Amino acid sequence: MTGEKIRSLRRDHKPSKEDGDVLEPCEEEATAALGGAFTGGRSGPGGSGKGGKACHKIFSHHHRLQLKAPAVPGPGVPAPPQHNAVTATCPAPACLGGSNPALVADGGGCPSLYPVHECVFKGDVRRLSSLIRTHNIGQKDNHGNTPLHLAVMLGNKECAHLLLAHNAPVKVKNAQGWSPLAEAISYGDRQMITALLRKLKQQSRESVGEKRPRLLKALKELGDFYLELHWDFQSWVPLLSRILPSDACKIYKQGINIRLDTTLIDFTDMKCQRGDLSFIFNGDAAPSESFVVLDNEQKVYQRIHHEESEMETEEEVDILMSSDIYSATLSTKSISFTRAQTGWLFREDKTERVGNFLADFYLVNGLVLESRKRREHLSEEDILRNKAIMESLSKGGSLAEQSFEPVRRQSLTPPPQNTITWEEYISAENGKAPHLGRELVCKESKKTFKATVAMSQEFPLGIESLLNVLEVIAPFKHFNKLREFVQMKLPPGFPVKLDIPVFPTITATVTFQEFRCDEFDGSIFAIPEDYKEDPSRFPDL
C-alpha cells in the first residue's frame, strides 16, 4: 500500500437496505457500527500513517453503498409505482402464473412488463443492445431489482458492461436495500467491482453538476444571514460516551457564497479530531474550485475534488473486497408525532424557548433504524482480522496502531451456476425473490429510535431554505444526516431542536441557537493570502 490518500465513498429503499444512499452504519455490535461511522481527516494534527488511513477506510467506505430516509407520502397518497414505461400489457392472471393477489395488485409478476430484465437474466446481449435504446434501463422489477442488479448477481458481465455504457444507475437499491455495487462485492469479480465503483463516482459528479444551477438560484433568492447551531453527540455504548464530541457551528451566507466554521473535523481513530476548520463554497467560482476547506491552525487549504487516481481506486476496491457489506436504512414507514407533555399533576403540552425562539415539543414515534451486514465474500482470515481490529479499538486502541496493509485482492471463485428460471424468478411472491448469486451470509438488526423535535413558528428560515444550505455542506457527513432527517414530513414550523440518528449507536441533538440577517466582509469567503495549499490535508473530503 502506498502513501496515497484514501477517501471514503458515500451511498435508498427499505431494507427488508452506496445514497442511501442508503450509508451506512447500523450494527448492534457497537464497535463495528462505529467503525463504519468514524470517517474524516488524518489521525493526528500533522498527518497520518498509511496503515491507519487504510484501516479506517474499511469502516467508512459503506457510506457510498446508503443512511437515506425514504420519503414519507402524505395522508392518502399512495407510493409511486416502480414500473417503467413499457407498452406491453398484462392481459389476465394467466400472465401472472396464478392468482397471487399481491402480484395482480401491482402487475408485479408479469414477465412482459420487464423485457430488459428478461434478456439480462437469460444473457441475451443481442436483444439487450436493441431494447436498451427504447426502454428505461433503470426500471425496477417486482423484487426491486434493476437490470444492472440482475446482470451483476448472475455474473453476466457483457450485459453489465453494456448497461454501464448506457449509464445504468449504480446507486439505486433493490427491495432488500442492496445496490448493484454491493451485489458485485458479494459476487467477487474485481473487474466488475472496479467498473461499478468508477461509474458510481461519475454519476455522483454528474448529479452534483445537474443540481448546481438550481442550488445557485435558490441561494441567490435567499437573504444573507448568520446561523449558529450546536451539535451534541451521545451513545448508549458506555465506552463511547466519554469520547463523543460536541461542536458549535457557525454558518455565514452571502449571495451565493457560504462559509461554515467548525471545531469538529471529524471522527477518527475512535477519537474525535478537533481543530479550527472553515468550509467555503464560492458559487461564483468554477465548479472545480467552488469548494475549499481551510485548516486555520496549520494555515493550509485543500480544494475538494472529485477525481481519484487509478491507484486510489484500486486501493478502494481492495478494501471493499475485504470488508463487510453494510446497509442501514432509517425507516419512516410508521412514523408519527405526538405532543410532548410536561407537569406532574396537571399535564400540558410542552412549549419552551430554544435560544430566542418559542417552540412546541413533539415525541417522534415509530422511527426504526434497520441494518444488514453481509460477509459471504470474506474468508475466515478476513473475518478474524477485522474482528481483531474492532476489539482493539473497543479497548481504546487506535487505527494507527494497527499495521494494516490491504493486499491486492484477486477475484473470487464465481458462485455455482444459476439454476433458477426467469419464470420462477419473476413470478415469485414480492419480498420472497429466489436468491441469485453467492449464498448469503447476512445478519440483520433493528433498533427503535426514540427522539424529540422542537418546532418553532418564529424561526425566520424555512425548511426548504435550510435544505439548500445543507446540500452545499453535505461533504460533512453529520450535516448530510441532518439534511436527510429534515426531509421527513415534520410537524408545522422549523425544527429548532431535534434528535437525529447519525449512526446506529450514535445520536446527535442539534440545536439552532441563533439566527440573524446580516452582511459580511467579502474576505471571509476567500482563501487568506498566507495560507498554502495541501492537496492531501483532508483525505476523506
Curated annotation (Swiss-Prot):
Q: Where are the ANK repeats?
A: 111-142, 143-172, 176-205
Is Acetylation one of the keywords?
Answer: no
Q: Does the keyword Protein transport apply?
A: no
Q: Which UniProt keywords apply?
A: ANK repeat, Chaperone, Endoplasmic reticulum, Membrane, Phosphoprotein, Repeat
Q: Could you name the Gene Ontology cellular component terms for this entry? A: endoplasmic reticulum membrane; perinuclear region of cytoplasm
The Gene Ontology biological process annotation of the record reads:
protein retention in ER lumen; regulation of anoikis
Q: List the disulfide bonds.
A: none
Give one GO term, molecular function aspect. Answer: signaling receptor binding
Biased composition, class Gly residues, residue ranges: 37-52
Residues where Phosphoserine is found: S411
Q: What is this protein called?
A: Ankyrin repeat domain-containing protein 13C
Species whose genome carries this gene: Mus musculus
